[in-house]
Structure formats: C-alpha cells, structure tokens
C-alpha cells in the first residue's frame, strides 16, 4: 500500500501471504507514475533494495528508507521524515479494525479486496 497520510491510501494491491515485498513494491511505485515535484516516499526497510530505490528516483519520488546495516555505502536517511512512517502503520491498524477485513472470512480475492476498498473509503471519509 502507498498512502498519503494516516487516512488516505493512494494505491494498494492484494498479494498472497508468501509473496515478497520487493517485486510488489516496484509495481506499486510504477502505478504511482512520474511526479512533477519531488514527493517523499516513506518506506519500510524491506523495500530498501537498489532496484526499488532507483525506480523511485526515476519517478521523482524521494525514498526515505533506512539502508541495511551491513551495507558498505549507506545512503542518507532523513530521520525526521522517517518518523512519520507510523502514519501508514496507523492506517493498517484502522483498516484491521473492520472485522471482515481482519478475519478474512471471504474465500474470493475480489470480495476481500472490495471490503478492503470499502474500509479505505470509510477511513478517508471519517
């Protein structure tokens, strides 16, 4: 999920539980498209690969992600901006407050995705 704030999701997708974060993150960044002005992209350390970072920079997105501790040449991290990443985590918590999303009753992906979309819309309108 790419979110603008603790209430607004920009783009999201549904993946299997065993799917890796890197390839999906690349697809989400591609879905955002190229931005006119630089936009800060607060990311989890799971998205800290060179390919994903380069893909974000090509689209005028400034990735704010900590580099791996073993990395020889760590990239700079804006710690003040990275602290704002908890807003996205709060959005996940709010979505999971909807019982149907949290318990995953639905067998079909499209039905589950519809309820996640509904939860995102309700959170945006709140």
Question: Where do the language-model regions lie?
Answer:
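Short, well-ordered strand-loop elements centered on a beta-strand within folded domains, enriched
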Residues: 6-14, 125
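Charged phosphate-binding loop/patch that engages nucleotide di/tri-phosphates or the phosphate backbone
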Residues: 115-126
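Mobile genetic element proteins and their domesticated derivatives, centered on retroelements
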Residues: 1-2, 7, 25, 44, ...
